[in-house]
């Protein structure tokens, strides 16, 4: 039976995050926006992450699981991109979580003319071990990718050169074969953005900062 094409593919690379994974997956499956698929890429995790992913896939048909030998964060995300069928792409780290309106607010920010292809960016909350919270606000605006210097100043200056807290157009990604660069640690998100942005019709920055929760700790996503 032919599978319906979802509007959004949510890609989660998974590695050694057993204590956080259930909260992450549950937060995505609880979205008010329901037209999405969830791609969980188990990057050879040594703990029970692979089993947890399979358990969720058995309970929810929107969940698709891919198991691979450990190859690193970039390769795990690329595996998700390889299999993503949605019109749009969102990344969530497996040790973070999102509020129930996260996808809805990103999707609602897109232009009415869906033939335009670009990027929506939002702020996020950073949660610290002591329970304190720091909200990273971004100035609400629209930037044309042709203004490269302004794009870089806004993104780098506001510390939002992460793959997550964004909605990408999968048509651009597929058409231009855009991927994360393997074996690059710490810069893979920025390099992906720099490959992607020149093809975008727009860059929408929206100050919906409380929807993505980045848990500040020693990051344990795919190594």
Describe each model-derived feature in a short phrase.
Residues 1-223:
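Nucleotide-sugar donor-binding/catalytic module of glycosyltransferases
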């Amino acid at each position: 039976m032919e599978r319906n094409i979802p509007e959004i593919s949510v890609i989660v690379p998974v590695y050694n995050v057993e204590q956080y994974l259930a909260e992450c997956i549950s937060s995505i499956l609880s979205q008010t926006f329901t037209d999405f698929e969830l791609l969980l890429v188990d990057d050879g995790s040594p703990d029970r992450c692979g089993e947890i992913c399979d358990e969720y896939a058995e309970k929810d048909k929107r969940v698709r699981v891919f198991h691979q030998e450990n190859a690193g964060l970039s390769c795990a995300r690329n595996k998700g991109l390889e299999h993503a069928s949605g019109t749009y792409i969102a990344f969530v780290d497996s040790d973070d979580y999102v509020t129930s309106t996260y996808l809805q607010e990103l999707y609602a920010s897109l232009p009415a003319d869906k033939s335009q292809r670009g990027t929506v960016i939002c702020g996020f909350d950073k949660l610290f071990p002591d329970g304190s919270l720091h909200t990273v606000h971004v100035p609400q605006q629209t930037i044309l990718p042709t203004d490269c210097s302004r794009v870089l100043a806004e993104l780098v200056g506001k510390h939002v050169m992460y793959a997550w807290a964004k909605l990408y157009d999968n048509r651009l990604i597929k058409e231009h074969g855009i991927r994360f660069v393997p074996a690059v640690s710490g810069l893979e998100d920025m390099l992906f953005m720099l490959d992607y942005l020149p093809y975008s019709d727009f860059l929408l920055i929206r100050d919906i900062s409380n929807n993505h929760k980045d848990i500040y700790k020693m990051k344990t996503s795919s190594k």
